């Protein structure tokens, strides 16, 4: 069976693992998933990312992050631009998530970046997901 939206699958796997408080999770790798995982690590939503090479496409292992009393760091993930309905934002219309408490992941002409980085570089693009 062909997966129509691998990014939504990634976000759902993270959400499910986070809900049951798994320490780590694995998912099939791709370049865009790897970039999203690196953004999550850089922004402090996950502890670490490992790429595991295999004969096929490889695997990403994400180490989820929890607070001191085991509270979730990631409280929500939402796919915005979908294969059936793409959502774009101009440079001056880049959205803020929860008043700046969360991040929006954008695919721009300069690569994948957060909403803060897109505003600093004054670029717009496709709004991939919201994470808070």
Swiss-Prot record:
Keywords for this protein: Ribonucleoprotein, Ribosomal protein, RNA-binding, rRNA-binding
Keyword DNA-binding: no
Subunit record text: Part of the 30S ribosomal subunit. Contacts proteins S5 and S12.
GO biological process, one term: translation
Identification of the protein by name: Small ribosomal subunit protein uS8
PANTHER family tied to this protein: 40S RIBOSOMAL PROTEIN S15A (PTHR11758)
Family from the record: Belongs to the universal ribosomal protein uS8 family.
This protein's GO CC annotations: ribonucleoprotein complex; ribosome
One Gene Ontology term of the molecular function aspect: rRNA binding
HAMAP family: Ribosomal_uS8_B
InterPro entries associated with the record: Ribosomal_uS8, Ribosomal_uS8_CS, Ribosomal_uS8_sf
Designated gene of the protein: rpsH
Function: One of the primary rRNA binding proteins, it binds directly to 16S rRNA central domain where it helps coordinate assembly of the platform of the 30S subunit.
Cystine connections: none
Domain of life: Bacteria
